[in-house]
Amino acid sequence: MSKVDLIIQSGSTILYPIVEEGISLSWDRKGSPGKLKFSVVKDSVLSFQEGDAVKLSVDGTDMFYGFVFTKSRSGRAPNVIEVTASDQLRYFKNKDTYVYSNKKASDVIKMIAEDFGLSVGALEDTGYVIASRTEDNATLFDIAQNALDETLRAKTKLYVLYDKVGKLTLQDIESMKLNLLIDADTIG
C-alpha cells in the first residue's frame, strides 16, 4: 500500500489534515492547470485559507505543489471541507497584452513567469526565434501556446509546458517518452 502525505502550509504553520474519501489529482497536456481535489475533516487545529500552499507526496516522491483555490463545506457532513488546489499554471488563465520580437517560445514563457512572479524550473531551449508577435488581451495560456505553435510549425518539434511540483517546466515531448508497453498482459 502506498504512503500518501498531504500537507497544507498556512503561513508558518504546517498542517497534516485528516483526509476523507481519497484524493483526486488531474493534469491535461495543455491549456489547463494541474488540479488536486480532496476532502478534509475539520478539527480544532485545522485552519487554512484560500491561497495557502498544498503539497502531495506518494511514497516519498513529490507529486503536486499548488495553492488552495476553493474550499467549501458539504451539506452532507458539515465538519468536512472540500478543497480544490491548483498548481501555478492556474495563473496562466489571466489575460494580458504582450508585444515582443526576436524571442524564442522558451524566452516568452520565462518573460511571462518573471512578470507574474512564478517559479521556473527547467525551460528547454526551443531554438526557433519568433521575429515579432503582438498578443492583445489574450490569456497567458494562449500567449505561450501561440509561441509554441509557431515553433512547432517552424521546427516540427512539440514542447509541453507543465508545472513540475511548483516549478514551470518546458520539455520536448520526445524526451518524455517512457520505455513502457501497455497491452493485455500488463493491464491484467
What label would you give each PLM region?
Residues 1-91:
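Assembly/oligomerization scaffold segments
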Residues 54-56, 98-103, 183-188:
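Short intrinsically disordered coil segments
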Residues 78-81, 87-89, 124-188:
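Short beta-strand-centered interaction patches in the first periplasmic/extracellular domains
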Residues 94-102, 131-134:
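Second-shell loop/turn segments in exported
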Residues 102-109, 140-144:
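Generic alpha-helical secondary structure
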Residues 104-121:
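Glycine-rich, acidic and aromatic/proline-enriched surface loops and short helix-turn segments
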